[in-house]
Design a protein with these regions (language model features):
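Acetyl-CoA-dependent GNAT
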Residues: 7, 11-15, 22-102, 113-115, ...
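Alpha-helix N-cap/helix-start capping motif
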Residues: 14, 133-134
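Conserved G/P- and acidic residue-centered "switch" motifs that form tight phosphate/ATP-binding loops
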Residues: 107
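Conserved short alpha-helix immediately C-terminal to the canonical SAM/SAH-binding motif I
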Residues: 112, 136-139
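Conserved GNAT acetyl-CoA-binding A-motif
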Residues: 113, 120-133
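Conserved catalytic-core motifs of GNAT/GCN5-like acyltransferases
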Residues: 129-131, 146-165
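Conserved active-site tyrosine of GNAT-family acetyltransferases
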Residues: 140, 145
Length: 171
């Protein structure tokens, strides 16, 4: 018999910051380890695993919360391109997706993405863009995203993180 997975997807709040940071750290340190060198992760993860207060309060960032109250997934979207205030009409950007390593492959990230797509479409978004880690590229492909190009994302003056730029047209 398969156990039932019970969780809700809700809007994040600023009070979720510590739990989201812990979730990002648990997820990225485990799930990225087989795709990136340890030395790179040691330099990059401190920048990548801190919850973004602007995203948390945006009304477009979501958390999956288990029936026991723990945060087991997160992710969202923004109209602004990451790292800028630039907005391109009809375009949105997928932001800070993660699933706790003990809860992967249960549809949690897909549930959050479905919520992102629904809410983005309600804001007249027709195309989603994301900057995927190598570990998440197949997840995004399974959701209909196409690979556009490789990229190196600057995280600090001495830290650049290899990634994959992807996009998807919303139906």
């Amino acid at each position: 018999m398969v156990a039932t997975v019970t969780y809700i997807v809700r809007l994040s709040a600023l009070s979720d910051a510590d739990a989201v940071s812990a979730l990002l750290a648990a997820s990225y340190s485990t799930l990225l380890a087989s795709h990136y060198e340890k030395a790179l992760l040691d330099r990059a993860l401190p920048f990548m695993t801190k919850a973004n207060p602007t995203l948390l309060a945006s009304g477009a960032f979501y958390v999956a919360q288990s029936s026991h109250g723990e945060l087991i997934g997160c992710g969202g979207w923004s109209l602004e391109r990451p790292g800028t205030a630039k907005i391109v009409r009809g375009e949105a950007h997928i932001r800070h997706f993660a699933t706790h390593p003990g809860w992967t492959r249960l549809g949690i990230a897909r549930s959050i993405m479905n919520r992102c797509c629904m809410d983005a479409k309600a804001r007249d978004v027709s195309e989603l863009h994301c900057c995927s880690t190598f570990a998440a590229e197949n997840f995004y492909k399974a959701l209909g995203f196409k690979t556009v190009a490789g990229a190196h994302i600057p995280l600090a003056s001495q830290v650049s993180f290899p990634a994959v730029l992807m996009q998807q047209a919303l139906p």
